[in-house]
A protein has these predicted regions:
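Single conserved hydrophobic/aromatic residue that forms the stacking wall/gate
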Residues: 1-12
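Generic serine detector
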Residues: 2, 17, 30-31, 37, ...
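Membrane-proximal envelope biogenesis segments
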Residues: 10-66
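Bacterial extracytoplasmic/cell-wall-associated proteins, especially those involved in peptidoglycan
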Residues: 42-186
Length: 186
């Protein structure tokens, strides 16, 4: 079940018809038998299959919404990979919060995501991104969805490390195993 904002609008826009087919789904399942029974939803408009990326762009344009922060395909993939590495075991809200930290730093520092990921010492691992990580990137960077209205920029996992520096910043919230902070001003 997808949790991205786009799926909410897929069903609310009302200009697309939905066709559910029980065939092999392009998702990882536990067995070939489970794969065969997995429903796969196709969306159509005027008899043509709809590319969801085009739908979100069209919906946003029609609604007068601009993407909050335009990403290249390579940046989108790399951020999703980092979310998978940094917050793969966290709930969706945790992935949103980590993506929000990256976005906030991009906007505050005026730098691109690749520089944020390098300078701010995000994980150097780049695993295959999960669907949730891809959706979190879309929700945060395209639609401006955030986990908090506070401008969080930093986080760490206390179970994995101690960080006096993080704790010297302004604590905002904890989501599962991560503590999130906004920048302390002097």
């Amino acid at each position: 079940m997808s949790r991205g904002l786009g799926d909410v609008y897929k069903r609310q826009v009302g200009m697309f018809s939905e066709h559910t087919q029980t065939k092999t789904a392009p998702v990882t399942t536990s067995s070939p038998a489970a794969e065969e029974s997995q429903p796969y939803v196709f969306y159509y408009k005027d008899g043509q299959a709809v590319n969801w990326e085009d739908v979100t762009d069209a919906w946003a344009a029609e609604a007068g919404i601009q993407k909050r922060y335009a990403l290249t395909d390579a940046e989108r993939l790399e951020i999703a990979q980092v979310l998978t590495a940094e917050a793969g075991g966290e709930p969706f809200a945790g992935k949103i919060a980590v993506a929000q930290c990256i976005l906030q730093t991009c906007e505050d520092e005026g730098i691109r995501p690749d520089e944020v990921l390098r300078v701010y010492a995000y994980s150097k691992r780049r695993p295959e991104p999960t669907q949730e990580a891809l959706e979190a990137v879309q929700d945060v960077f395209d639609f401006g969805i955030v986990a908090t209205t506070e401008p969080v920029k930093y986080f760490y996992a206390p179970a994995l490390t101690d960080s006096e520096w993080h704790e010297s910043q302004i604590y905002v919230m904890t989501i599962n195993g991560h503590r999130f902070f906004k920048e302390a001003t002097e």
